[in-house]
C-alpha cells in the first residue's frame, strides 16, 4: 500500500533522530526480565538437609553463650566457632578467605568479665569491583532465660542457629560462583549480650572506609508456626529503617524529609530490590517489607551497620513463638519450652536462605547504584528531568528510571533510557510520583535504585 506524505514524514523523522543519536545513547536493551542462569542455579543448590545438619550441630555444643567454655572441643562457644570456621574452609575448597575477627570486651552491659568476642568472617572476593561489599550475617551465640547464665543448656536452634546455618549454606554454595562485587558471610558473636560482635565489625568497616553497599542479618528465621498455632511458611518479614533515629540528621536525610522521601532511605531502596529479586527466584514466597528498624523490645545485628550509615536489613520469620525464645528448656503446664531443633522448619529456613542468596547474587553481579542523582526543580512543569554521574563498569549497558505512586511501597513503572547521563520523563510530574535511577549491565543485572535529590539550576 502506498505511504501517505504524513507517514513518510514520520518515518523519515524517526530515522533521522536515530541517526543523530550518539552510539552511547542508542538503546540496545538487555533482557532485564529474564531469570539469570547463575542465580537460578544458586537458588536450586540451597539444601534444607544441610541447613538442618548445621542447626543440629550448633545445638550439640550445649550452650553457645558468649561467656561459656572456650577450651573444650565439644562444649561451649569456643568449640562452636572453631567448627564453623573449619566447615566454611572445608566446603569452599579455598575459595573463601575465612578468618576470626576478635577483640576483648573488658566488661559492661551483660558482660561480667573480660571476654574475647570472636566473629567468623568468610569473604568471597569480587572479580571486577572487589572494593564494593555486601554483608550477610547470623549470630551463633545463644542464651537461656537468664542472659548471664553461661552454663545451662541453651540450644538456640531458631535464635539463631537458623540464621547461622542459612549463612553457612549460602557461603558454601556461592563460593563455587564468581561475582563482580565482594560478599562477606559472617557468623557473629555476642548478639544476645548487646550486639557486641556486629558493632565491632561495623565500626572497623567505617574506620577503614569500606564501601558496604548493603547488609542483611538473618535472625530467627527457623519457624513457620506462632505460639497460637498460626502457620505461615510462605513469607518472611524484612525490616527496613526509614529515617534514622539520630539527634543530628545529615543533609541527605534532611533532603529526604523535605521531599517526602521518608521511604526512600538507602535501606528501603535495598529492601525493594531484595523483595523484587527474592520473589522472582523463589516463586510463591512473599517478602513483606516492614517499615521499621526492628520489632518492639528487640534488636539485631543490622543495627550497628545502620548506626554507621550503611544500608542494612533484618530477615525474621512472620510468626514468632516466644515459648521457644530465651527460655530454659523445660515442660511447664504441659507446654514444652525452650529453643529446640524439633521446632525448626528447615524447609522454611531454606526458602529464606534462597531469597537471601538470590538477592546477594543479583546485587553482587549488578553495577553499583548511580551516584549524584539529581532532579531539576528550577521551574513548574509536568515532566520530570533527572541527571546523574556516569558509572565506571566496563559492561555497563545503560540506565533505567523507575517510579511509583507516593502511596506505594514498591516500584510500579520503569523505562530503559540507554547509556545517557540525563533524561526527562514526559507527562509524569515529580509532584505525583517518587522516582529512582538504576544502572543496568549488558547481562541485564540491575542495581539498587538511587533517589534523586532536588537541584535548582
Show the residue positions of the predicted features.
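Conserved aromatic anchor
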Residues: 382-395
